[in-house]
């Protein structure tokens, strides 16, 4: 688990990158770590809790996935064939589509927390991690890179075990508030992002996986914010 923590978060822990892909099925298990501080901020109801909660979240998980969302959006929005879209996604310069996507996902998260319950960031992170795991489970890599690197070691058994972890981490919140079951709808956003990626690029790379995680978290918070 420490290897996955070292790669997927900014927590200062030593890990082996080569072993991280052996632990990728444990992605949902990162949620208590990544969502603890943001959830605590919301629970304590301190001033500017919405902004501070999101800032603390990215302080823990870093900006890698957010950067992936920007690249993904640039590729999705460009007109042309798959080759042109992939080239736009891999361009080191962020375009207007990428900037717009990042700004929108941040605004959605911050403003959703005005009405969403304190545990919503936990559910959003849990969904985000599960959606990323499901994206990797497609086994449809886009060339060589991080996407293929993690897909290669992800078996059906490991995906199932990841699903079990997801369920076990979800149950306590469902017992606390049965209406939180609606958070599951947030996964639809991630699944749709996977479909868009496959339709536009023909596969998934690290940018696509990061975008799936960000979109799923934003969709979950939006649903919980509206439902509340």
From Swiss-Prot:
It is a multi-pass membrane protein. Its cofactor is Mg(2+). It comes from the Archaea. It is an enzyme of class 2 (transferase). GO terms for biological process: cobalamin biosynthetic process. It catalyses: alpha-ribazole + adenosylcob(III)inamide-GDP = adenosylcob(III)alamin + GMP + H(+); alpha-ribazole 5'-phosphate + adenosylcob(III)inamide-GDP = adenosylcob(III)alamin 5'-phosphate + GMP + H(+). Pathway: Cofactor biosynthesis; adenosylcobalamin biosynthesis; adenosylcobalamin from cob(II)yrinate a,c-diamide: step 7/7. InterPro entries: CobS. GO terms for molecular function: adenosylcobinamide-GDP ribazoletransferase activity; cobalamin 5'-phosphate synthase activity. Keywords: Cell membrane, Cobalamin biosynthesis, Magnesium, Membrane, Transferase, Transmembrane, Transmembrane helix. The chain crosses the membrane at residues 24-44, 50-70, 96-116, 117-137, 159-176, 181-198. GO terms for cellular component: plasma membrane. Its EC number is 2.7.8.26. It is found in: Cell membrane. Belongs to the CobS family. Joins adenosylcobinamide-GDP and alpha-ribazole to generate adenosylcobalamin (Ado-cobalamin). Also synthesizes adenosylcobalamin 5'-phosphate from adenosylcobinamide-GDP and alpha-ribazole 5'-phosphate. This is Adenosylcobinamide-GDP ribazoletransferase.
